[in-house]
Amino acid sequence: MRFRSGVAIDLGTVNTLVSLAGRGLVIDEPSAIALDRSTGRVVAVGEAADALAGKEPQDVEVLHPLRDGVIADLDAASAMLQGFLRRARLRRGLLRTAAVVCVPGGATWVERRSLAAALSVVRPRCTVQMVDEPVAAAAGAGFDLAQGAGVFIVDVGGGTTECAVVAGGQIVRAQSLRVGGNAMDEAIVSTVKVELGLLLGRNAARSLKTTLGLADDGTGWMETVGVDAARRTPRVEHVSGRLVAKALEHIVRAIVDSVQEMLSDIPPNLAEDVVHGKIRLAGGGALLPGLADRIEAATGIPAVVVDDPLRCVARGAAEILEHGDGLQRGPVVQK
């Protein structure tokens, strides 16, 4: 299917990215919405809403409507999406043409329908084309979907990790894990609390993750600020790379195991493509220091992070929106 006008949406657990045909990326903001508790009025969406999280007034509630890559709160997701599209100044006529929406490869039919429903609330009578995230990631990494060559994609998002072999515009083999960057942050928060008696906020945990990553050689460390679990007072602490690596080990191991299991089931005619094409890491989790090296060491196949991994899926969705060549269609929902 080829779309010459419309909108491409990567509605992620952590961030939402919106591209318009002919204009490119116009929205890249946190998937968050702030609502007035008493009236339900939208107070803020995106960055402004996310900035209120943990600091919001008593009469304001901050929601993150997606969980594990799919919609957990349909009303909040619809309102958030409406705010983004209004800010993008999307003309109503354009969306009557087409919308390309990225979904986790492991999303159920019900979860896919909820995404279509969220969009239909915002703009009725549109054609929603669901595209599996690994396919969009392959397009965003520069691979021609019209060609039959296979590419191995590991897309580590905020709520899910997708391991997939993509060839000819469709998924040949895939596994979806309901863990990603958010689970890594939570693991760091939990480990630091247990090991150091320090309560960390989400942003502090994320900084430890992206700075120290899997540096478990004992040489790396980072200063962070949290709340002493016993005294309930602010405290400065030096956190080692070894402790962060320990916190992340079970998640990284699950990702590596999934990659290895996928490789053991790869069709022989695609094996050469994968080895020569390398394992391509996309998504925010791809920026975890040491993850690509860990996958390469476990598999013996070069693993590299794609250019601008945070926007790779959105870039591919925009490419499919404007060109669509070679895409094997997923469910199409007419509204």
Spans of features found by a protein language model:
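Nucleotide/phosphate-binding catalytic cleft detector across ATP-hydrolyzing
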Residues: M1-V154, V166-R280, A286-K335
